[in-house]
Amino acid sequence: MKPEIHPDYHTIKVVMTDGTEYFTRSTYGAEGDTLNLDIDSKSHPAWTGGTQQILDRGGRVSRFQKKFSGFLKK
């Protein structure tokens, strides 16, 4: 590998939606940072088989639905 071209790879703490914490190595943030997940394998409908709504953080889903609500409708 070429030196000096790869991002820093360090240990971070990941906090899942239910509060479970674990440590992993990542290029995210800096050494010791915490990554708080909004959706994970314990809460995402694709893995739970549920039909629950995904939490709309920052209104992005709402803006998307509003913008494309009439798309492909006759």
Curated annotation (Swiss-Prot):
Keywords: Ribonucleoprotein, Ribosomal protein, RNA-binding, rRNA-binding. InterPro entries: Ribosomal_bL28/bL31-like_sf (IPR034704), Ribosomal_bL31 (IPR002150), Ribosomal_bL31_A (IPR027491), Ribosomal_bL31_sf (IPR042105). GO terms for molecular function: rRNA binding; structural constituent of ribosome. GO terms for biological process: translation. The keyword rRNA-binding applies. Pfam families: Ribosomal_L31. GO terms for cellular component: ribonucleoprotein complex; ribosome. NCBIfam families: L31, PRK00528.1. Belongs to the bacterial ribosomal protein bL31 family. Type A subfamily. Binds the 23S rRNA. This is Large ribosomal subunit protein bL31. It comes from Afipia carboxidovorans (strain ATCC 49405 / DSM 1227 / KCTC 32145 / OM5). The lineage of its organism: Bacteria, Pseudomonadati, Pseudomonadota, Alphaproteobacteria, Hyphomicrobiales. The gene is rpmE.
